[in-house]
Swiss-Prot record:
It is found in: Cell projection, Cilium membrane; Cytoplasm; Cytoplasm, Cytoskeleton, Microtubule organizing center, Centrosome, Centriolar satellite. Part of BBSome complex, that contains BBS1, BBS2, BBS4, BBS5, BBS7, BBS8/TTC8, BBS9 and BBIP10. Interacts (via C-terminus) with BBS7. Interacts (via coiled coil domain) with MKKS. Interacts with CCDC28B. Interacts with DLEC1. The gene is Bbs2. The BBSome complex is thought to function as a coat complex required for sorting of specific membrane proteins to the primary cilia. The BBSome complex is required for ciliogenesis but is dispensable for centriolar satellite function. This ciliogenic function is mediated in part by the Rab8 GDP/GTP exchange factor, which localizes to the basal body and contacts the BBSome. Rab8(GTP) enters the primary cilium and promotes extension of the ciliary membrane. The lineage of its organism: Eukaryota, Metazoa, Chordata, Craniata, Vertebrata. This is BBSome complex member BBS2.
Length: 721
């Protein structure tokens, strides 16, 4: 139970997810939040007489205890914490789409300012792995960077897509923090420094992550889903029609275990049990919640949960006291038991009513009436499921097919399928019309990504005249590479792109991997090495060849570098391979990347020219303005008018130049994203240490602008000595 202890109403709007709290003088906790017009406000109710008078910070004209920090750019992320332990107080970190600012509020000075080409969408501050100093870690355009208090770039790696959320958590229980990364490609990745140690695939963009305790962490998605993971196992999740704006871990009932606090877009704040997701506490704001943080804001020795709304309302809550703990827990347990027993009672009453109706129907109906009208089916009725590949036709695209059938003359009235990431809304209902009922149903399935998916099936079985149906529930797993059909090898269509590596495994184990990950026909006969199998993608018709020699050498031919990476990662997981070096060549993809790198150089060159032109125009504006004012003071109106007309034209040129700069920057970001993704893809072709070496060597090659070395690294995994 949370107890409200204070409410503030600031006359400043707060940007969603842009709230941080810190002791910027080492003593007093102050709230910082991004507000309108590229500013950050600092609310300091403890020292109302303190005024700032520097170029960057100024007193708010609306409130005496609020100071404004001028960023002059749209703020994209905000954080606070100890970046330099020697200072003894917290640093404010402000990220934009082009830079990162570490600001020392106590001394009103920049700790450092860094241009960040990949932007800063998310930010977290803390210690990562064995890297000794605290880092300000930012996630941007497919890249992760970590800076120390001097602005030195001590950590860099790439990830699969644009980063939306970051958190530090001891994921593997080794006493050191790992980095959790949520991105646009729906994945949560766990980095142990620059090595990916785990990946969890979700159903939407991961917008928020927060550590809870140990290896447990909370997450939120852009579709209104929130939940809790413990390592790679999901404990629970719930989905709302509203969006989760902010999540935070806080112990509201003094039981030593943090609950998941969620602030929603409709203004609701709720606290959920980390074990079950059950709502323990809720409150409401009049507008959307902007952020949830914690701190001793009243300086009374008690930590409060602090919730902020986008309209500037701030509320502080205290957790329930230890004396209340027993009563609260007892009440919660009792309520849970009552709910559970009530649900069981309802289910039993419903089942009893069905039996009574069947008995009445049996007594009132003639003895020769079909049993189907009574909702009765044979006791030995079984439900069979089979997965196969359908190559499609003119009316329907190629797809995977789930066939559900009964073992006798009963019919299937409806099928409910629950599966993550395949159907809109994560569920699909097949409900044939009355004249199309049969004992068999075929359901087309088209997974958008190559990931294994559990299909949870609920099948309603009865007779045509039945008004009640038996529900068969079962789970069927969709293999990872379902969307690939086994075809006959054709040397003419074999892709020129390949990856080549050696595994110390028997051919039978390789065949087992194929059977687990592909939908192979029952009559396929793959026995011993050497063997050669060919698949065709149902999505785009691309070819995939997998060859294995008796020596254990495996060659995978495909023009899709992402597919090659998925296959290698799948094999590494199945065969428990820790380190795998690979030789790879993707001529078409590498040529496209070469063009992208040339474009990046061009855009950088254009950016420098535009910046130089803007600087020249700025100097010219100062000169024209002085001349125009001189002419005005001398009452030379003709000259003044001429100068102001020149200023007007120059201003138009500046605006046009700004639009060109914006377009150039957008194009540059798109190409930098492609470069970062290329490095990520080259890394995914390897496993373990070779993977980390490739990513690091690729970055060094790009820094030195050595394109030929970059492609050699991507091909063979190492730079030339």
């Amino acid at each position: 139970m949370l107890l409200p202890v204070f409410t503030l109403k600031l006359r400043h709007k707060i940007s969603p997810r842009m709230v941080a709290i810190g002791r910027y003088d080492g003593t007093h906790p102050c709230l910082a939040a991004a507000t309108q017009a590229g500013k950050v406000f600092i609310h300091n109710p403890h020292m109302r007489s303190q005024h700032f008078s520097t170029s960057r910070v100024f007193q708010s004209p609306l409130e005496s205890d609020v100071s404004l920090l001028n960023i002059n750019q749209t703020v994209s992320c905000l954080g606070a914490g100890v970046l330099n332990p020697e200072l003894g107080y917290d640093t404010l970190l402000v990220g934009t789409q082009t830079s990162l600012l570490a600001y020392d509020i106590y001394n009103n000075s920049d700790l450092f300012y860094r241009e960040v080409a990949d932007g800063a969408n998310a930010l977290v501050l803390g210690t990562l792995g064995d890297i000794a100093p605290p880092l300000a870690i930012i996630g941007g355009n497919c890249a992760l960077q970590g800076f120390d208090h001097e602005g030195n770039d001590l950590f860099w790696t790439v990830t699969g897509d644009n980063v939306h959320s970051l958190a530090l958590c001891d994921f593997d229980g080794d006493g050191k923090s790992e980095l959790l990364v949520g991105s646009e490609d729906f994945d949560i990745r766990v980095f142990k420094e620059d090595e990916i140690v785990a990946e969890m695939t979700e159903t939407e963009i991961v917008t928020s992550l927060c550590p809870m305790y140990g290896s447990r962490f909370g997450y939120a998605l852009s579709n209104g889903t929130v939940g809790v993971y413990d390592k790679t196992a999901r404990y629970w999740r719930i989905k709302s029609k509203n969006h989760a704006m902010s999540i935070h871990a806080f112990d509201i009932n003094s039981d030593g275990v943090c609950e998941l606090i969620t602030g929603w877009s409709n203004g609701k704040v709720d606290a959920r049990s980390d074990r079950t997701g059950e709502v323990i506490f809720k409150d409401n704001f009049s507008s959307a919640v902007a952020g949830v943080v914690e701190g001793d804001y009243r300086m009374d020795g008690h930590v409060q949960l602090i919730c902020c709304s986008v309209d500037g309302e701030i509320r502080g809550y205290l957790p329930g006291t230890a004396e209340m703990k027993g009563n609260l827990l007892d009440t919660s347990v009792e309520q849970g038991l009552i709910r559970e027993l009530s649900q069981k009672k309802q289910n039993l009453l419903l089942e009893l009513r069905n039996y009574e109706e069947n008995t009445k129907a049996e007594l009132s109906s003639p003895l020769n009436e079909a049993d189907g009208q009574k909702g009765i089916i044979p006791a030995n009725t079984k439900l069979h499921t089979a997965l196969s590949v359908n190559l499609g036709n003119d009316a329907q695209d190629a797809h995977a097919e789930l066939r559900i059938s009964t073992s006798n003359d009963t019919i299937i009235r409806a099928v409910l399928i629950f599966a993550e990431g395949i159907f809109a809304g994560e569920s699909h209902v097949v409900h044939p019309s009355t004249h199309n009922l049969s004992s068999s149903i075929r359901v087309p399935i088209t997974p958008p990504k190559d990931v294994p998916v559990d299909l949870h099936l609920k099948t309603f079985v009865g007779y045509r005249s039945s008004t009640q149906f038996h529900v068969f529930e079962l789970i069927r797993q969709l293999p990872r590479f379902t969307m690939y059909a086994l075809t006959s090898p054709d040397a003419a269509s074999e892709p020129v792109s390949f990856v080549n590596f050696i595994v110390v495994e028997r051919a039978q184990r390789m065949v087992t991997w194929l059977n687990q990950n592909f939908l192979l026909p029952e009559d396929s006969n793959i026995q011993n090495a050497p063997f050669h199998v060919c698949f065709t993608s149902l999505r785009n018709g691309g070819q995939l060849y997998i060859k294995m020699k008796p020596s254990g050498e495996i060659t995978v031919n495909t023009d899709d570098i992402d597919l090659a990476g998925d296959i290698i990662q799948s094999m590494a997981s199945f065969f428990a391979i820790e380190d795998l070096q690979v030789e790879a060549d993707f001529p078409v993809y590498f040529e496209e990347l070469r063009k992208v790198l040339l474009k990046v150089d061009e855009y950088h060159s254009v950016h420098q020219k535009l910046s130089a032109n803007m600087a020249d125009n700025s100097n010219l504006i100062r000169s024209l303005l002085v001349r125009a004012e001189d002419a005005r003071l001398m009452r030379d109106m003709k000259t003044m008018k001429t100068r102001y007309m020149e200023l007007y034209d120059l201003n138009k040129d500046l605006l046009n130049g700004y639009k060109i700069r914006c377009n150039n920057h957008t194009e540059l970001l798109g190409n930098l994203k492609a470069v970062n993704q290329a490095i990520q893809r080259a890394g995914r072709l390897r496993v373990g240490k070779p993977k980390n070496q490739v990513i690091s060597a690729c970055r060094d090659a790009i820094r030195s602008n050595n394109i030929n070395t970059l492609f050699r690294i991507m091909r063979v995994g190492t730079a030339p000595s």
